[in-house]
Design a protein with these regions (language model features):
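Basic, polyanion-binding surface patches
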Residues: 1-210
Length: 210
């Protein structure tokens, strides 16, 4: 570690610098459901880009069956996410996961979550998640070292709890919706609102100077 000006040059083992957590549900070969947490997810238009391990059950399922649901938990639901964290749907457990992960076929039950049918895809939704995005993987690309997959998923339908929707609109209320953030392997919610983008179509609530 060395210092340059006012910054230190460091080599962190991970770069999870604060991104939303999602729960990805996919369909197994036998028609049952797999559910996996991940924090490498971002949206561009109606496409959500996902990064996931190449040897996991989610990757295996999406290669064969492209349907999925991107379920977004709230900050308060982090214990359910953590219950899923040490589980894998792969049997046998992949070599790189042995010792830290265990095989669990009933992921919904293990997390204390309830499945509910989707409308346009075969994968199931997580009933407790306020936002549920039915989607289909349209492109799957390996990374440079074949350790991960980059999945481009086209969102087909969005389900939202009325509590996080601006009444009478198609907008998610940013003052009501509090995503779960994965910050260097710690779980966080959002702090108070600081401001808004010039492109926002929802009103500012309780921000000083506005």
């Amino acid at each position: 570690m060395r210092q340059t000006n006012d910054h230190l040059t460091i080599q962190p083992k991970i770069l999870y610098y604060g991104t939303p957590v999602v729960l990805i549900s996919t369909e197994n070969e036998d028609g049952t459901s797999n559910l996996a947490p991940m924090s490498s997810a971002w949206a561009l238009g109606q496409v959500v880009v996902l990064g996931l391990g190449a040897e996991g059950q989610t990757a295996h399922n999406l290669r064969e069956r492209p349907d999925l649901v991107i379920n977004l938990p709230t900050a308060e639901q982090w214990p359910a996410v953590e219950r899923l964290a040490p589980l894998t749907g792969r049997d046998p457990v992949p070599d790189h996961k042995r010792g830290a992960f265990r095989y669990e076929p009933a992921k919904f039950a293990a997390a204390g979550l309830r499945p509910e049918p989707a409308e346009l895809v075969r994968a199931q939704r997580v009933a407790e998640c306020p936002l549920q995005l039915e989607a289909r993987a349209v492109r799957i690309t390996p990374d440079l070292h074949d350790d991960f997959l980059i999945v481009e998923a086209h969102v087909l339908r969005v389900h939202a709890d009325p509590a996080v929707v601006v009444p009478g609109t198609q907008h998610v209320d940013p003052t009501a919706w509090c995503p779960l953030i994965y910050n260097f392997r710690h779980y966080f919610g959002l702090g108070p609102q600081l401001g808004q983008s010039f492109r926002s179509e929802t009103p500012v609530v309780g921000v000083a100077g506005n």
